[in-house]
Structure formats: C-alpha cells, structure tokens
Amino acid sequence: MQSVLTRIDHVMICVANLEEGIEAYTRLGFNIYPGGVHTGRGTHNAIAYHEEDYLEVMGVRDRQEYLSSAGPGGGLLEFLSHGNGLRFVIVQSDDLGADVAAMRRRGVEVSEPSTGGRRTPAGYELQWKMAVLGPDHPLPILFIQHLTPLAERRAQLPQAGNHPNGVRRTDRVYIAVPDVAAAAKTYSQVLGLPVPPIQRGAVIKADMAVFDLGPTGLTVAQPAEPGPAAEAVSRRGPGPFQVLYRTSSMDGAARWMADHGVPPPARGVRNTGEQAMLVPPEHACGTYIGFVGPA
C-alpha cells in the first residue's frame, strides 16, 4: 500500500516555562498564542499556525498529573532536565490506519492509532488520532491524523499565519544522527520512502539525507565538521535540533528580530544556492531556527 503521509504537520519544542517560550518565539517574529491544555495529560502548549502546518511550544502544567499519565519514566521531565529543545517531529497522515498497517508490513513496530485532544482557552475541543513508534524503532517522530479540520483549528487563534517574520510554512526539519547511512535506511523503512542520496549540508556542516514529505523535508544529518549539527550533538546528543522556515522576506524577519533584541542571525548559502539565516539555540529555546526566502 502506498504511503499516505502527506507532510510535516508540526514540530514540538519543549520548555520548562511556557510563558518564556512564548516570549522567545514572539521575539523571533511568530504570532504565537496559548493553545490550551491536554486534558488528563498534565501539559499545556502554545501554537503558531503557518499556512498548513504549525509550531508547538509545550510544557508541563501539572507535574503530578503528567507523571500519572506518562508513567514513572516521565519522558518529558527527563528531556527537560537537559534543557529546553526540539523533542519531536510530527508527520501528518490522511489515513493513519492505512499508514500504520503499511508500516507493520514493512516490519516497523508502531502502535494502533489512539484518539487525543486539546481544550483551547475558549473551551473548544480539538481532536486527532496519533500513532507512536515502538522500542524497536526509537525515532523522534510521531504520526498524526487530524479529526478537526484545519480551518476550525486555525480559527481558534488570532492572526493565524500572519507572522511579522513572514513565515509561510515549514521547509525542513533536521535530526542529528551518529551514522547517516544507517539512519537513512531506518527512516526509509519507517516512512515508506526510497533511501535518499547523501550530500554535504553547507550550512549545518553535516552529511545529510533528505526525505521529501509533500512540500516539507525531513533530514537526518551526521556532523562532519564544527557547525550547528556538531554543536547540537555535543550539547544534548542525537535528535532533532533545527527547523528551517520559508519566509516571504528575509530582511523583514531580520528587522523584526533586531527591533526585539535578537542579535543578527548568522547567514550562509544552502546547497540550493539560496541565502539562509540561522538563529542560535540560546535565543530559540534550545533549537536552531532557520529562515530561507527572498530578501
């Protein structure tokens, strides 16, 4: 069965203090607002919608409720004990049941889809189905199928998609790995996509393989020399470390950030020949945030 995974749906950046996370991403030019609470899960989040995907900043709202729902491991608390950062990449499906069945036929250990939800500050219940990988495939990706239409979800937040930094969509997400060739084979099996060619990433200074998911790309990257990928691995080990956003104006994004106290982002030239700029993790809750687009 052909994969019906459609795109990167969102990234999950986890923070110890949600208000501080909102403030940080507001300084970067995102219109980000409290998204509500995950009922019975002890967590809450803030959301910045783009055209069809979004940014989620999440924190623990009630420690005891979280531990009761997550079990004794308390994975999010363990993650946050090493600092804020990008924890999961969430991939969207149009038919999660079919994708789960297809993954299992490929030998992937994955859960049955389960229903989840979030109550917005206005009391509106948003719903989705989610599937997670098992311990034989401990990758930092989750799978989602939204049950609430995009227009209804966007309507819950003011100025949805109208960001001062001009961001229109997620372009690419980067995951640091110790062995890019081995990781590319594993992600190929999980995603149901061919193994991509390995290339040297000019900005992240890593050997990388890019999986195209609709208009978005999921990249596994092995550090090759000092740079963002190597720094991220030295700081907290392998895992997601960077999000690249496509903006309508690089200069407009830079001006907003300068006006809000963010130092000028480093600039570089991507493999595509495009100019990109990169905000370091100390200004983005432990995550590299990149921008690419016209001046």
Map each language-model feature to its residues.
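Short beta-strand scaffold segments in enzyme catalytic cores
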Residues: 46-48
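Glyoxalase I/VOC metalloenzyme domain signal
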Residues: 1-8, 13-32, 50-197, 203-295
